């Protein structure tokens, strides 16, 4: 083996391995201290890009879950208020039925009307004050809003909240009154016993209701025939013996027309819009029609509550799906970017041992040129 002074190859080799061990030791310490095995693009350029995309998706999913939970909270708030609206309407219906009873005096009905008026005021107060985050929910100003329930654009769901005030057209319908009242002595006559009621339902389909009363039937029996033929309209008789027909906005679209011999004899007039806001139970006829008006309002409220229930269930399933996606995305990101501490600790120990060994060998290699001095003796 040649003895060289100018070039110490052994020392250079030991130095190279020492540098490599030091670099590996530094990398392991960085990974262990940060918790990430990819800390810069030089560690894994492709892995860094993939993990960043997964991180963006994961954060977007977290926001989407929060958005969906906000949507559920809004729906729950509105549905809770509508539950109380339902209770109020049911009480108003009870009072209408009570007032329609013949045992009540005028003073009794006036007292009942006072409670109906107070309940109407409370119904409107609920509609005007129910809010979430400063947004009014039930007074008609919320309209339709979108809820972003996905990590990317375009993944939105629409929520509509209707006006629950008592003067909303959907909280009632149209009332058709006969011009001619019929007393207890009136009865249906042969040749003039037919009545055709033509209307269009909310799906746009034309409907015709044909009534054939029997000779000798009175006005109350005629109303019973109408109610027995369809639930699209509700018929009753007021205090003056006038037939009144109510068509709820939740079932009938547009005007109702009357034809036939009975229509001419009764003198059915043009319809008047009526809502819960204007119900009057101070008369038997008004109380009876109030029942039909409140029934239409209850169906409208219940229908909207059902929609909110479906919305909440949909969002609950959406949240479960988002959580599942986020779990898998986070797991994938972790496999790519996160440090395997068991593996990295082993690598650190290895690099530390190699560093110590390289340092020892380098020290010995530096002593090799001293042999040249001994030869010069």
Curated annotation (Swiss-Prot):
NCBIfam families: PRK08869.1-1, PRK08869.1-3
Subunit note: Heteromer of multiple flagellin subunits including FlaA, FlaB, FlaC, FlaD and possibly FlaE.
Family: Belongs to the bacterial flagellin family.
InterPro entries referenced in this protein's UniProt entry, alphabetically: Flagellin, Flagellin_C, Flagellin_C_sub2, Flagellin_hook_IN_motif, Flagellin_N
One function term, GO molecular function aspect: structural molecule activity
Source species: Vibrio anguillarum (Listonella anguillarum)
The protein's role, per its UniProt record: Flagellin is the subunit protein which polymerizes to form the filaments of bacterial flagella. FlaD is not essential for flagellar synthesis and motility. May have a role in virulence unrelated to motility.
Official protein name in the record: Flagellin D
Subcellular location: Secreted; Bacterial flagellum
Superkingdom classification of source: Bacteria
Entry keyword Repeat: no
Transmembrane domains' residue ranges: none
One Pfam family it belongs to: Flagellin_N
GO CC aspect terms: bacterial-type flagellum; extracellular region
The entry's keywords: Bacterial flagellum, Coiled coil, Secreted, Virulence
Segments forming a coiled coil: 104-128
Keyword Translocase set for record: no
